[in-house]
């Protein structure tokens, strides 16, 4: 698998201001609905879809390093995506000189 990096913000400070006092926000990066999570001064990007039954995680809460689905209360580790025998896709964030990038895996023969 390869990773394609997509620029999505200017800086971590911009993200802090955008989130204000919220912990989570649904955003779209390259036509993908993702959830931006701010927890313990770290930022995470996860798929905005619970792997349990496909519900959106827009109203999820963050507890003890886990994102908790508001519908069925399944919790998923923010760093690994693991939880309840299921796996929530998470995406790396990389800071470069010109901004913040989200990494999305893709398959390529070359």
State the predicted function of each range.
Residues 50, 69-72:
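Short cysteine clusters
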